[in-house]
Amino acid sequence: MARTDAEKAQDYTAMGHSVELINAVIAGSQMADQDATERQACVDRNVEHLELMKAKTDWGSEDMTATTNAIAAGKGYTAS
């Protein structure tokens, strides 16, 4: 079933939240009080979410640059 424009907009917003969280965890401004395992799991979950959403074929003109960059950063991240 095809997503509506409203659903796509909601999904795109959620992707932005994942991008922000990945970047913040990597920068140390989010989840700094959590252990490395929890930070890694958070980044991994959000990368997986972004990969699944980005792979959808019904996107229009949405800019996926931040998503692509967050996926790459998240895949390169190793919590310590």
Predicted regions and their residues:
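Beta-rich interaction/scaffold domains
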Residues: 2-80
